[in-house]
C-alpha cells in the first residue's frame, strides 16, 4: 500500500462563519485526500476536545494551533506509515496526544487527519470512500432524517425542542425519499407563510418560525405533509431532537414554561408519541441522567427509538455502559465527538452487535465535506441526519448519497421502514 508522504492543514470557515480545520494528505503514489472538520453548537460535556486559540482573533475561535499541530507534530509522526492501516494511524495520533479527550493536539486536528488519510487511501485503492471503508456489503442507503423546523440552540424561534425532523419511510429509493422530503419542506414554507409566521432559516436549513409549543410545531409539519400529498406516519414519519441538556438547570428540565422532573418529561414524551407518529427522540434527558434514561427506556423504549447524542458522544465506553444499564436504544454518530474514524467504527459496531440502531449525523457548523454520507452507507447506519434540503453544506451530503445510489445501481437498498422495525407498521 502507498505510504504517507506529506500532511498539510489550513484554517477555513464553516457554515456558521467560524474557523475549522481542513487537512490534505498526499501519498507516495500521488493519491490525495482532503477532509474538513465539523463543529457543533449544542455540544456534550463528554465530547473530545475541540482546540480553539482563544484571544481576540475570530472571537477566540481560531484554530491555528490545531493547524500547527497537524503540520509540525502529526505530519512527522505519520510520515512513511502505510495509508491503509487506519487503526494504526489513529492509534499513533492518540498516543502522540496522550490525553483521554484529545485536548493536547485537538480532536479537530486528529479527526481532520484521520478522515483525509482514509480519503487518500480510498483513492489509492481506486475505490469510492463508502466501498473502501465498508467493503462489498456496503449497499444500504439511509433514511434522511430531515430537520425542517429548527428550535433550541439552532434558532431563535422560542420553542425548546432543537430539531423537528421528517423521515420519508415509505419511499422505495433514497432518491425518492429525498424528493418527498424536499416537497414537504417547500410545502411547509407555504404553510408557515400563510399563517403569517417567519420563514427565516436556522443553522441547519430548517425554518425557524416563532411557535409557542412542541405540539404547535408538529402540527405545522403534519399539515405540510398532508398538503404535499403524503400520508402522515405511512409515507412520512416524525422525529425529534430535544437536546434536553440545553434546558436542564438546577436539577430540573425548564421546558415550555414549567420545571419538570425526568419522570414528568417521560410523560411528555409518552403523550407525544401517542398523538403523533414519532419514530425517534434524540437526547430526551440530560446527558448524565443514567437513572432517568434507564427508566425512560423501560417505559417507552419499545414504542420509539431513543437516541443518545450528548448522552453517548459516539464513545464506545459510554455506549457500553448504556447497553449494560439498558439506557436508550440507538446511537447518534458524530465523528468529531470522538475524534478518529476507527473509534467511530468501534462505537457503531458495538451498537449494532447489541441491537442498538445508529444514525449518522452532521453538526450545526458544517462544510462541503461529504465524508459522513459515505460513512452512513459504509457502516450500514440506516439513518442519516444532515439537515434540511437547503444550504449547500447540508445538500452536499444528500447529493453524495444520490451518487452512491447511482454507483450501486441494482444493488442499492433503501432502508425505509426497516430502519425502524419496532416502531413502524
UniProtKB/Swiss-Prot annotation:
The keyword 4Fe-4S does not apply. CDD domains: enolase. The keyword Cytoplasm applies. It is found in: Cytoplasm; Secreted; Cell surface. Mg(2+) binds at residues 241, 282, 309. The active site is at residues 204, 334. Keywords: Cytoplasm, Glycolysis, Lyase, Magnesium, Metal-binding, Secreted. This is Enolase.
Amino acid at each position: 500500500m502507498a505510504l504517507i508522504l506529506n500532511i498539510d492543514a489550513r484554517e477555513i470557515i464553516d457554515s456558521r462563519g467560524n474557523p475549522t480545520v481542513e487537512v490534505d494528505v498526499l501519498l507516495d503514489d500521488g493519491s490525495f485526500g482532503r477532509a474538513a472538520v465539523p463543529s457543533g453548537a449544542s455540544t456534550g460535556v463528554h465530547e473530545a476536545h475541540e482546540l480553539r486559540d482563544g484571544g481576540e482573533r475570530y472571537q477566540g475561535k481560531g484554530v491555528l494551533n490545531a493547524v500547527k499541530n497537524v503540520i509540525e507534530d502529526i505530519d512527522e509522526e505519520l510520515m512513511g506509515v502505510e495509508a491503509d492501516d487506519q487503526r494504526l494511524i489513529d492509534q499513533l495520533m492518540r498516543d502522540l496526544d496522550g490525553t483521554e479527550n484529545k485536548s493536547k493536539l485537538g480532536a479537530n486536528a486528529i479527526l481532520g487527519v484521520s478522515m483525509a488519510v482514509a480519503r487518500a487511501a480510498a483513492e489509492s485503492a481506486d475505490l469510492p470512500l463508502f466501498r473502501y471503508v465498508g467493503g462489498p456489503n456496503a449497499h444500504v442507503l439511509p433514511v434522511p432524517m430531515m430537520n425542517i423546523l429548527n428550535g433550541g440552540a439552532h434558532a431563535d424561534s422560542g420553542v425548546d425542542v432543537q430539531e423537528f425532523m421528517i423521515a420519508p419511510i415509505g419511499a422505495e429509493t433514497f432518491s425518492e425519499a429525498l424528493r418527498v422530503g424536499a416537497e414537504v419542506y417547500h410545502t411547509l414554507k407555504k404553510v408557515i407563510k400563510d399563517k403569517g409566521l417567519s420563514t427565516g432559516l436556522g443553522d441547519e436549513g430548517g425554518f425557524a418560525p416563532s411557535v409557542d409549543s412542541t405540539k404547535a410545531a408538529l402540527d405545522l409539519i403534519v399539515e405540510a405533509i398532508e398538503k404535499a400529498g403524503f400520508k402522515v406516519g405511512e409515507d412520512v414519519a416524525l422525529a425529534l431532537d430535544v437536546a434536553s441538556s440545553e434546558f436542564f438547570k438546577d436539577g430540573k428540565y425548564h421546558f415550555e414554561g414549567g420545571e419538570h422532573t425526568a419522570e414528568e418529561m417521560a410523560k411528555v414524551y409518552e403523550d407525544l408519541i401517542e398523538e403523533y407518529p414519532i419514530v425517534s427522540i434524540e437526547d430526551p434527558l440530560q446527558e448524565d441522567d443514567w437513572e432517568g434514561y434507564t427508566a425512560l427506556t423501560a417505559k417507552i423504549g419499545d414504542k420509539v427509538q431513543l437516541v443518545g447524542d450528548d448522552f453517548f458522544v459516539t464513545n464506545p465506553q459510554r455506549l457500553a455502559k448504556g447497553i449494560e444499564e439498558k439506557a436508550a436504544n440507538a446511537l447518534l454518530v458524530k465523528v468529531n465527538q470522538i475524534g478518529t474514524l476507527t473509534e467511530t467504527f468501534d462505537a457503531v459496531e458495538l451498537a449494532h452487535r447489541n441491537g442498538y440502531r445508529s444514525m449518522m449525523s452532521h453538526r450545526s457548523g458544517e462544510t462541503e465535506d461529504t465524508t459522513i454520507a459515505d460513512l452512513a452507507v459504509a457502516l450500514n447506519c440506516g439513518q442519516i441526519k444532515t439537515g434540511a434540503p437547503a444550504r449547500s453544506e447540508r445538500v452536499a451530503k444528500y447529493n453524495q448519497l444520490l451518487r452512491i445510489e447511482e454507483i450501486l445501481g441494482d444493488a442499492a437498498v433503501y432502508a425505509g421502514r426497516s430502519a425502524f422495525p419496532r416502531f413502524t407498521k
